[in-house]
Amino acid sequence: KKLPKNLPLKVKEIEKTTNHDVKAVELALGEKFKQKEFKNLIHIFLTSEDVNSFSYAIMMKEIQNASQNWVQEVISILNKMRSKYADLAMLSKTHGQPASPTTLGKEINVFKTRLEREIKTMKQLQARAKWGGATGNYNVHQLVFKKNWVTISRKFLKESEVELCEVSTQIEPHDFMAEQ
């Protein structure tokens, strides 16, 4: 099942009473399960880093989506300004000294083009999370249930448009955040 849209708000509400971020996520996710026996199994396989890396990935996706819309609006404004000031001559500078002439439209276009490139890069980046337990090896998972946990984890994360970091230690490296 898809995660509810209000999950972050629910987690924050629960966190007020638990004073523990991961426990709040566990309890909020547990509310999705109708059968009580499954509610109690949510945290059995996962470490705080598994839950946190997933949470970070979701937050980064939300930031990515929100900033793409905002940056797209800025690009649109810059594009109008570029056209409006295409012929407005001005003196450019290099090393703080007067240089050859340019136009204000061309200079605005420099920033518009850079933002367009960043939007393109942003759209290509994929949020990742680990889901393999204490050392990233699915040890507890395999001990309790002999399943293909990489496939199960990949499928679960994909439902939230998050890519599985298949090779990790206890900590997901968060490389995708640096790539943003």
Task: List each model region and its residues.
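A helix-coil-helix interface module used to build multimeric assemblies
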Residues: 1-141, 145-158
